[in-house]
């Protein structure tokens, strides 16, 4: 959270215990850039006084202890805000302070994931393969929590510019991951058959007939939609196509592959209005609607397989990108870190770290167009004494308005009008998030939708909350007038569109400045960084970024068997929170300086945060050997799944610091003297001796 705020220009002091961070990783170089690091012992009175002195000069204070732990150390947020009502305090516990069952758990990432059901809901592929639970090393809870916490902190900050009052915010990581995966958790009774995919049908069939879930990877591929799967290319690399649900993308794809006319001749049709019940369609299939019937899916996929073998993945990437339909090669993370586009766009940046030297790190997650360049050259982490840090904080003067109502409980965004032009998940979720804090949101959709009802209606159950909606044909004269009037009436405009489309709509900085000079514009897209790169204008979705940045190859375990991570929206919701942070930052800048800005984020920028434990490179770095593949049980013997006597699995979460304590227990006696490579077998035997509830 503080790294994200530091990238946006905040002065950050980070407190570590005397022995340094508990988590020893090169990723700390990224997490602590733009920070002064001080070592303080919060378990002694002197350390508490030092911390209180630093807090006395801060605008925002962030802690991630278990609920009540910080107060027990002598730093009570409630008391501090009683003394300084302008202070913003942010708590990020693993489990909520009112979760009486779990609040005291040592809530490491894997514990939160196991408790929240993440490892038992890792996608339809894993269900059909019979892999359950399924481990993932991605820190989903921390990544979602970081974006929720940073956006809420800045929303509270901009609200303080109007009221003079701070606030207390709690972002439990377990709650964050539940919202982050909300698009995987939609269950509708009586859902029409048109929305049920081939994989879902196969799962239901096997459950009814009592058949095992034991499909191979190859068998699974034949259950995928042809516009939502990977294809083998001439160079042996897989290429991921993501062209379902859109009126034009699937058609452009088939035309580029040279098989569109052939398929039309065979009977492939396009319905004029796919929102009608399928019983009223002229045919049983409509190109651009997800999912396709199996007979058509098989026929189209067979032809696509043949054509993809005629070119390399890189060639196809250029064809898809320039043709304005989504597709990308499957890459490993190491390839993405050193990719030309990642470098030139600022999605990956060089930082001169004092320990690792020149280090490639993820670029900023969120930035403002007018000042984003500064975030490409962060100051490396620096260790200082407390007096130096305190002196720097004192130099930062805060001017606040006079408090007129000390009991003000209005929403952070009350009185702010937002125009939502977004589609799919990330953009609409961003604005729905703003609505919960009091923003008045107007959602504008085309009268003739480009996306099918799977995208607009099903996903809209979540992201349409808190909005008023209008359907307008903006290509007509009257429609353009209506859009113009709406643009003039709002404070904020949010859209996930490429720059050329933004210019066509008159929402570029110059044109918007003439229509509504006070309006803040926020853009979300697929491949943008602070600077332009060769793929900046390529269109794409969450899954495409998973493919491009190495998430799918890690999850599947190999280049030839990449897998989508979970179902949908793994990065989308993070990016949505990033869009909200962009809006909040621009609002704060406007209130603080009068400058009207343009917020930016992208799915690719958020992928760096999601992979932050592994997303770095430097000379001398070891192998990129993060846990990968469908059968990996965990990180190591101390953090992994173990089979128990009750016939299920237990997530054991420990570390090297715990070895003496474990060795003191009768059940684990002898673990301290074991070589590390013998721990798995030792612990497997122990956990198999009793049930999960007993453990």
Predicted features by range, described:
Residues 1-165, 314, 384-595, 619, ...:
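N-terminal helix-loop segment corresponding to the beta1-alpha1 unit
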Residues 11-12, 321-336, 441, 695:
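Short, well-structured beta-strand/strand-turn elements
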Residues 94-96, 173-179, 235-237, 244-248, ...:
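Glycine-rich beta-alpha junction loops
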Residues 111, 136-154, 173-185, 194-197, ...:
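Mid-domain beta-loop-alpha active-site segment that forms a flexible
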Residues 156-218, 228, 332-333, 586-630:
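Substrate-binding/catalytic subdomain of NAD(P)-dependent oxidoreductase enzymes
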Residues 205, 211-213, 217-218, 232, ...:
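Terminal low-complexity tails and localization/encapsulation signals of metabolic enzymes
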Residues 217-223, 227-323, 638-695:
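Aromatic-enriched alpha-helical interface/lid elements that frame and gate functional surfaces
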